[in-house]
Design a protein with these regions (language model features):
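Helix-loop element at the rim of GNAT/NAT acetyltransferase active sites that forms part
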Residues: 18-31, 73
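Conserved GNAT acetyl-CoA-binding A-motif
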Residues: 109-119
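Conserved acetyl-CoA pyrophosphate-binding loop and the N-cap/start of the following alpha-helix
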Residues: 91, 95-103
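Active-site rim helix/loop that mediates acceptor-substrate recognition in acyltransferases
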Residues: 31-52
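Conserved active-site alpha-helix within GNAT-family acetyltransferase domains
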Residues: 98, 122-141
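Conserved beta-strand in the GNAT
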Residues: 54, 60-68
Length: 147
């Protein structure tokens, strides 16, 4: 029944795909098997900046986090960017999201990063309740230029 947070491993591929497809479905983002294969390739390549963590309980994966370093020129420092955080809906409320965030925070602290940053949907109230306990909401507004 113990929760284990660890780096994603090659043997996690099927469970990771299930979780990542669930994450895409939650945000109503079309995601193909080929797209998941690209991300899995990144996570499997030690030379790629994107890293993956998983939350495991009773031998089953219940959550994932993807993160990477990013340059912060204005402060001449490096931060960590949390690209994805997802916990299986059946496993929510038991601390997996907080544990994944704590593991990303620990990785960043060990590397000398100055911040862990991420975005979430404004209406993602359940996740925001966790984030509001563990982090500070910023004043920044996000923009995209689609290419």
């Amino acid at each position: 029944m113990a929760l284990i947070i660890r780096a994603v491993a090659a043997s996690d591929k099927a469970d990771w795909e299930r979780l990542y497809a669930g994450y895409a479905a939650f945000y109503k983002v079309e995601q193909t098997e080929a797209m998941r294969a690209v991300v899995w390739g990144w996570l499997s390549d030690p030379a790629h900046a994107t890293e993956g963590l998983v939350a495991e309980r009773d031998g089953a994966l219940i959550g994932l986090a993807h993160f990477r370093a990013f340059a912060r020129p204005l402060s001449a420092s490096t931060g960590g960017y949390l690209d994805d955080l997802f916990v299986d809906p059946e496993a929510r409320g038991a601390g997996a999201a907080a544990a994944l965030l704590a593991a990303v925070q620990a990785a960043g602290a060990a590397r000398g990063w100055t911040v862990i940053r991420w975005i979430t949907a404004e209406d993602n109230t359940r996740a925001r309740a966790v984030y509001d306990r563990l982090a500070d909401q910023t004043k920044w507004v996000t923009y995209d230029i689609r290419l």
